[in-house]
Amino acid sequence: MRAHNLNRATDLGDRVEVADGLWDRFMGLMGRRGLEVGAGLWLTGSNGIHMMFMRFAIDAVFLGRPDPERDSARPVMSVHRGLRTWIGLVPFVRGASSVLELPVGTIERTGTAVGDLIALEPAAGDVPA
């Protein structure tokens, strides 16, 4: 998937994986060695994350529910830069319904801020499910 910031005309990632099942959301990025620029993980149905058992820091963008008047773009509810391994924790973000986990520096590089609208759409080369 592609995560595109409509307000800033920037891509947060063009290789974003979707974790929509219980096991996929539980595992998240645990066990991975890192994320390349452009990669990410979209945790659906989540409004909090932890960094236990993680091997690398991440940026996290918490998204609200899709806005049908804005082509189902999701508003940014909260941003967290450089969440550190083992001690990083965001237990609950009011109004969030999903989380984008991204490489450190993505939030700064894209200028993403609370209130921006993020479109999540198939990326070039994605195979429909």
Give each language-model segment a name:
Residues 1-129:
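Compact, glycine-rich, soluble single-domain proteins
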